[in-house]
Structures are given as structure tokens and as C-alpha cells.
Amino acid sequence: MLSDIEIARSAKLKKIDLIANELDIPEEYYNLYGKNIAKVSHKYLNELNFKNDGNLVMVTAITPTPAGEGKTTTSISLSMALNKIHKRSIVTLREPSLGPVMGIKGGAAGGGYSQVLPMEDINLHFTGDIHAVTSAHNLISAILDDYIKYNKYDIDSTQVSWPRTMDMNDRALREIIVALGGKKNGYPRQDGFIITAASEIMAILCLIENLEDLKKKLSNIVVAKNKKGEPVTVKDLEITGALSVLLKDAINPNLVQTIENTPAFVHGGPFANIAHGTNSILATKLALKLSDYVVTETGFGSDLGGEKFYDFVSPTFGLKPSATVLVATIRALKYHGGQNLKDLNTPNLESLEKGLPNLQVHVENLKKYNIPVVVSLNKFYSDTDEEINMVKDYCDKLGVEVSVNEGFEKGSEGAIDLAEKVVKVSEQQSELKSIYDFKDPLEVKIEKLAKNIYRASKVEYSSEALSTIKFLKKYGYENLPVIVAKTQYSISDDPKKLGFPKDYTFTIRDFELSAGAGFIVALAGDILRMPGLSKVPNAVNMDIDNEGNISGLS
């Protein structure tokens, strides 16, 4: 089979203005970035209020292996298949972060015959959205150190909670000292870098509906404490306007297309293990007005991106999901059954059977939201008929629809059965039921998530967490929704607890306030916001020839 980049180059793309015209987007509401990319103005959403929303399909996954299980590929193939069965469909995805592209993951625009294109541009600099977020984020950092030097706002230099950022994996920058070299360089203090996808500004970009909303959320960001222990906000720094200027174009969704010319919005990129893990709400809302079905991907497993989509994003913006697609793979289930990571392509019914409870816990958890679930078994070349039949039989016992997806090798043709089943269950018109209410006390929200989703028997808080709770309550933040930051490799807070762990203690070690984005981050376990490169990073495989053809980006 051809490589992803070879398949992408062989695709016959339509000019993006033709895709926009097919969606009935007037020319004055989009700007072209070359022949194959356009930015659609957020203002166009105001012109669509008279239209009903289409069906919203959320794609999530079981607990993944380190390599991922193909949610993006599944989302793209499903959207293309819906179009093939004459349902107008748009897929909405997050933008790839450059760090993981150069690191262990490689490209993140789908794979095989289910890709969004132009994949080289999407995986690299794209339309500059991530650069804009990086610039805005670092402006805050620069202003903070400037104000500390000149003693404005009485900022406590030991209580600065706003790190610097860059869109690259670089572990050496996790903990640094800034302002060395004498008085002229400022006041020395401990600092660090996070990857841009982990920035609160990235989360805000994906949670705003217009410029007014952007300015309000930016103003509310808490960046430090003063020497009285009071929060210092961006509004206090008087740079809301400057930040908004830097982000004015980045807030507009990016329109591209799939390998089969299905429209795709690729916009924003917050991680799901430390933020809400979904593409921009502007992209989703635009897509809902322009199509019969919107397929949206959420990050990592259903205990992370899926949970946050149903407990935070959907209630906040009044979204009404019609179906859930749960991506599973035989190799991931064998991994949860104890099979070694390097042997996952070796058939093993015993390991598969032992790993099936991981599928069970995700199905059970998703059913609690009252949205119908379809399991999409993402087929790999190494899967045997016996293994596939074992998963099908198990899904029957769980009372859930299952479809074998071959979108990677066959494009839309490999996902027709999945599309038909999604349409069928969407007709049920179910109403979302979230796990917690926004009005619940912070500790109650966390307990409901821990027991219903993470399957813990109790929750414990460190002394640091208890101290932060007092701060949150004192300054009126306790009623914000909660985003649990935890490992993606287990439904628990311990990456070593594979399968279906239960009856354990879920530990919250501290909280971080994302007042601008509108949520509290509960930290469970050790979560790195600045990844490191792997021993052999994907960057060493990349090259470009004298004709400008890129290799190794897949």
C-alpha cells in the first residue's frame, strides 16, 4: 500500500472556493489561503440563525495504545461515507500540533484513504493559528516580567502561574530560570515552557463565538497573584486589546477537504488530557448549520475528550448530540489484556478476551449520557476473523451496534455500514444527560466523575489541592465546570492500571484555574504540559527534494 503522503499527492482536489460554494458560503465570508485552504469568517454564523442544526456525531475511543487507534481516520471515513449515502456531511477536527508531528506521532491528518488535505500544510504551519496563539500567550509572559521589573500591580514573582509556550516538544524547557544577567534583564525567577496546545489561549480560541466573547474570556485569564494573595488577571494588565488583535484572524475556522472532497473544518487544537480536547465551537456550529451530519472527533478515550464533550462543551453551548461512535481496535484490546506492545499484531484470542472489559467500561460509561452508541472496530491488516468475531459477539452481549471500519484501506466504501448504523441510531433523537450539574460544588462534581466514569470508590485530595480549593471558593470560582487532567492510558489516574480498574482511590494532587476558558483543571497524576521528543523522533525521517516534494511526513 502507498504511504499516506503518496496517497495524498495522488488525490484530485477541488479548488477550495468550489467547496465553499457547494456549502453556499458567500464569497465575502471567506478568504483564500492558496487554492486548497480558506478561512471562513465567524460573522457568517450570524447569517445562519434561521437554519436548523444538523445531526451531531461525536467520535471517541476506548483507552488507546501509545500509537493511537485511528479516531481521525474513522471520523474522516464516516463523514465521507455519509456523503456517499446522500447525507450532506462535514467533518470537524483539531489542528495538529507541530511538536507531536516532529516527535513520536508523525502527521495527524488521518491516514491511508481517509485523510484531510492538503496534509503537508495542515501538519506543518497551516494558516498560522497556532503561531498566533503562541504570540498572544508569550505577550502575556513578556508583560508580566516587564511589570515585575517596574513593580506594577505589586505582582508576587513567586506566584506567577503563567508559563511561556512554544509549539515544539522540548523537555529541556520544562523548568527554567529567566532574567539572569543582572538588573537590566529584570527580576530572576523560576519559569518554564508548555506546548502551545496546552495554552489556556488555545482553549479559549475553541470556546468563543465572536470577538466580544474572545475579549471577555481573555480578560478573565488569571496569570498570577499579587503580594496580598489576590488574583491578577489579563484585564489588570491592560492588554486584552493587544491579545485580541493578535488572534483576530485565528478565530476564523479553516475550511479544507477530505481525499474524496468532503468538506472539513480543521480548527484549534487543545489537548484532551489537560483541556477539553475538541475543535473550535465556531467550526462545529458553522458545520451544523451547513450540513445534515457533523462528525466531530474528541481527544483520547471516552473518559477524556468524550466526557468533556458531554459534560462541558455540549451543555455550555447547547449542543444536542445524536450519536456516539466509539472507536475500538483489536490491538488495543489485546494490549489491555496483557499482550506486549511490540507483539500486538500477533493473533492472541486469550489476550483479546482479557482486554474486552476495557471496551465494556467505555460502552457502559457512554450509555450514561443517554446518547446511542455505535462501536466502530477499526480494522488492521493483522486482525483475524476469529478475533473480529469475538469482538462482535461481545458487543452483542453489551447491547450495542458494531461495525467493522476499513476506511484506512478503502476510504468511504470501508465505512458505509458504519454510516448507515449512525443514521439509524440518530433517528432516536435522544436527549443528553450529563454526569454532573454546573451548580454542583466542586468536590461533588469530581466525586461524580470519579465514581461514574473513572470507576473509583473514593476521592482523596492532597494538602495543596485543599489549599487551592479555599482560594477558588474565596474568589468565586468554585462553580465553574471541572476538567480532569489525567493519563490517557487508563480510565484511572494511574497509567499502569490497564483494562477495567475499579474500587481504587482517585487522587487529586492540585487544581489549576482556567478562568478565561471557564473551567477548573483538577490535576490527577503527573501530566506533562511540555512533551519531550522520543529517542528516535519522527523528524529524522523527514526530507524535501529539489522539487519541493516532502517525504517522511506520515
Curated annotation (Swiss-Prot):
GO annotation terms (biological process): tetrahydrofolate interconversion
A Pfam cross-reference name: FTHFS
Any one Gene Ontology molecular-function term assigned to this protein's record: ATP binding
Gene3D superfamilies, alphabetized: Domain 2, N(10)-formyltetrahydrofolate synthetase, Formyltetrahydrofolate synthetase, domain 3, P-loop containing nucleotide triphosphate hydrolases
Pathway: One-carbon metabolism; tetrahydrofolate interconversion
HAMAP family with a match to the protein in the record: FTHFS
Family, per entry: Belongs to the formate--tetrahydrofolate ligase family.
Name of the molecule in the record: Formate--tetrahydrofolate ligase
Source organism per UniProt: Petrotoga mobilis (strain DSM 10674 / SJ95)
Encoding gene (name): fhs
